[in-house]
Amino acid sequence: DGKWIPIELKYTTKKCIKTINDEVYVLKEQGAKDQGCYNYLKDIMRIEEFRDKSNNFIEGYTIKITSEMSYLKPPTKVNCTYAEFSIEDGSIKTGCMNWATNTGKGTMRGMEAPIVLTGMYPINWKEYSKVDDTKSGTFMYLVNIISKKN
C-alpha cells in the first residue's frame, strides 16, 4: 500500500576463526571503530531525513551487530577524535555531533559532515549470540527505532 519502513543494518566483526558443528567460520578484523560509530549514527540521520520528506513513512530501524566489544565501552584515549559519535552502552545520541578538531583528514574522508539527529536515541546493547567464552565469541546487537513525527 505504498508505506515505507526503512531498515539499515551494520555488521562489524573482530577477527576470529571458529568451528561450529563441523563448519569453519572465518571473520575478518574490521577495526575503524570511529568510522563504524559515525556510520551507524549517519544511518539514523538518513532515516530521519527520509521520514521528514515522505508521507508514506511508518517507522524506521537501525541495527548493528558486532563481536567487537569495544563498541559497548566509552573511548579510552584522552584525545579521542570520535567521542561525540561513540555508541557506548547507556548513552543517548541526539543533536549535533562532530569530529574533534584534531581528527586526521584520512579518518574523516567522506564523513566530514556533522551528524545531526532530531530525535533522542538510547544506546542499549543486548546479547545476540554467544558461541564461546573467548573475546570474539559473543555477538551483541543494538536497535534504534526512528518514529514517525506526530
Regions inferred by a protein language model and the residue ranges of each:
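Well-ordered, non-membrane alpha-helical segments in soluble/globular domains
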Residues: 34-46, 79-86
